[in-house]
Amino acid sequence: MAAQRLGKRVLSKLQSPSRARGPGGSPSGLQKRHARVTVKYDRRELQRRLDVEKWIDGRLEELYRGREADMPDEVNIDELLELDSEEERCRKIRGLLEACLNPTEDFVQELLAKLRGLHKQPGFPQPSPSDDPSLSPRQDPAHTAPP
């Protein structure tokens, strides 16, 4: 009998509304937090980027049909957008497609047109490996060989 009461008490505490609430005291705190994160970015821009990425993947599959091993691993949209001119973008894209035996000029021109409507993805600046002191040789006198 006492065990039943104890079991009911534990069960009722586990099912209490205060336990069901997420962070911030709201019942669906996790969902609301995700909603705030996605609202932070422009959904249209993200959708455009996704559409361009899907288009790139589809076209690369067409261009490299039967020679998938030669297909570039990635066409980095942000890397292309960081380049200063359309000529540089064109050279970069053509360089990625050097191994393609099919004509690529239509793909290059269409991709350049699609890139004109996109903006670089906002994010945290990526430090250069040369900026990281942990990657440079140690300058500790105890570990430096005498001249």
UniProtKB/Swiss-Prot annotation:
Keywords: Cytoplasm, Phosphoprotein, Protein phosphatase inhibitor. It holds the Pfam family PP1_inhibitor. GO terms for biological process: cellular response to xenobiotic stimulus. One of its GO terms (cellular component) is cytoplasm. Residues 1-11 have a biased composition (Basic residues). The modification Phosphothreonine is found at T38. GO terms for molecular function: protein phosphatase inhibitor activity; protein serine/threonine phosphatase inhibitor activity. Residues 1-37, 118-147 are annotated as: Disordered. It is found in: Cytoplasm. Transmembrane segments: none annotated. Its main location: cytoplasm. Coiled coil: none annotated. The modification Phosphoserine is found at S26, S128, S134, S136. Residues 35-120 are annotated as: Inhibitory. Belongs to the PP1 inhibitor family. This is Protein phosphatase 1 regulatory subunit 14A.
